Design a protein with these regions (language model features):
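Preference for long, amphipathic alpha-helical scaffolds in soluble/luminal domains
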Residues: 1-229
Length: 229
């Protein structure tokens, strides 16, 4: 019997492929499965390609650059070509790290680069060029875990804690669902303080959060973590 054709890789969009890979991982699909393996091969083939951030990370597709990029939880991330390339590049590092994919890309060089760049840009190791890009890099570092990643994340959490909470109960400036999703994956005790700060806001939207599409499923996952006691 022929194996079912992959529904994970989308050669027109790195973003869609990465989000589908994450859902496959959460469903427990094996890395050795044909669909997952094909998608991982395609992602690794794009490292250092045309349009890659700093010529090093995973290159977005033409569709990714033309469309309004959204992170997996749906918040707008259309920050121009450089911003899209950066966020998707970080998300690709995260995906390959979580799938424990070593071959096909210069893992040590790439991970060392994102760690060291985080340490030197903007004067704070936990902040990158903007808040959305910062969260993307937190996710990549949490998955890849290079030396010193905990210190970088702790600084990021400190910066998050310095943000005031708006009238809706959310952090000012940070993408709410995307940040929650990042914190839910961060194995540091400091995340609990931030979870408590926004728990009431998460509880208000959880009961009406639908799971009709991939964005809804990622949002619900983040909200369920935020409201857990």
């Amino acid at each position: 019997m022929r194996e079912k054709q992959s529904t994970i890789v989308n050669c027109g969009s790195l973003a869609r492929t990465l989000w589908a890979l994450d859902e496959a991982r959460l469903r427990g699909q094996p890395a050795t499965g044909a669909g997952v393996r094909e998608a991982l091969d395609w992602v690794t083939s794009r490292f250092g390609g045309e349009g890659a951030y700093r010529g090093l990370l995973c290159a977005p597709t033409t569709e990714d650059l033309r469309a309004r990029l959204a992170v997996p939880t749906g918040e707008d991330a259309s920050l121009g070509r450089g911003g899209a390339a950066h966020i998707l590049g970080e998300e690709a590092v995260r995906a390959l790290s979580l799938w424990r994919r070593e071959e096909g890309w210069e893992r040590e060089q790439v991970v060392r680069s994102i760690r060291d760049e985080f340490r030197t840009l903007a004067g704070r190791p936990g902040h990158f060029c903007c808040l959305r890009c910062s969260v993307a890099r937190w996710r990549a570092l949490t998955a890849a875990r290079p030396d010193g990643w905990e210190d970088i994340l702790r600084d990021g959490l400190q910066l998050l804690g310095e943000r005031t909470i708006d009238k809706s109960g959310r952090w000012r400036g940070y993408p709410f669902y995307y940040t929650l999703l990042a914190l839910s994956e961060t194995p540091l005790a400091e995340v609990d303080k931030e979870r408590r700060r926004v728990r009431a806001a998460a509880e208000r939207v959880l009961e009406r959060q639908q799971e009709a599409d991939i964005v809804g499923r990622f949002r619900r996952r983040a909200l369920e973590w935020a409201t857990a006691r």
